[in-house]
Amino acid sequence: IMGRMAAAAKEGGASGIRAQSVSQINEIMKTVDLPVIGIIKRDYPDSDIYITPTRKEIEELLTTPCQIIALDATNRKRPNDEKCEDLVKLIHEAGRLAMADCSTYEECVAAQDMGFDIVSTTLCGYTPYSEMHEGPNFELLKKCVDTLHVPVIAEGKINTPQDLKQVYEYCGVFSAVVGSAITRPQLITKCFADVL
C-alpha cells in the first residue's frame, strides 16, 4: 500500500518521500523515482530515542537505496550509549546524507556542528524540554534558517496548506515534510466529522 500512497503523493506534487522501514522504502523506491528520507522507528528499554536510534537501524537502512537517512539528534541518551557523531560518520562513509531530527535550536546548531547535512524540527514539542505548539514552530524554523548554513527542513505539525505556505514564505525553509495531514485517512476524516 505504501507504494501506492507514494505514487499518489507524487501525482499530487510531492518532490520527495519520508518513509519508515526497509520494506516500505524498497516498495516506494520501486514505484516512484523520488528521493527518499529513510528512517526506522524502534523502541529500546534504555532510551526514549526511537527514530533510527542505533547503528543497527542505520545498517538496515543502508541495504535500501534511500538517499537520506534521518535520525534523532536530540540531547537525550541514545540506546547502548551510542554517540550521534559515530552514526553520522557511518552514514557518510556509505555515501548517504544524514538528516538530524531535532527539538530545539541548540540541537539544530549541535547537529550542524556534528556534520549533519540537513537539520529538521521533527521533534519540536516531542521532548520534555521543547516547546509544544499547535502547528509548526515558525520562530524556531526562522531562527534556524537565518543562522545555520545547512539546509533546514520543516517537519512536524504542518496540518494545513497555510502552514506549509508560511514555513516557506515566512521562515524560508529549504523543504518541508507533511506527514499525518496527508498520510492518515482517519485523521483527515476526523477533521471533517468534527465539524458536524
Stretches with model-predicted labels:
Residues 1-59, 63, 98, 106-114, ...:
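Conserved N-terminal beta1-alpha1 strand-loop-helix module at the mouth
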Residues 97, 103-135:
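Histidine/lysine/aspartate-rich catalytic loop segments that bind and position anionic ligands
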Residues 31, 133, 139-144, 181-196:
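C-terminal helical cap(s) of enzyme catalytic domains, especially alpha/beta-barrels
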Residues 1-3, 50-56, 82-86, 133-141:
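Charged helix-capping and loop-helix junction motifs
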Residues 11, 40-44, 64-78, 118-131, ...:
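Glycine-rich phosphate-binding active-site loops on the catalytic face of alpha/beta enzymes
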Residues 48-49, 53-63, 103-117, 149-154, ...:
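Catalytic cores of alpha/beta
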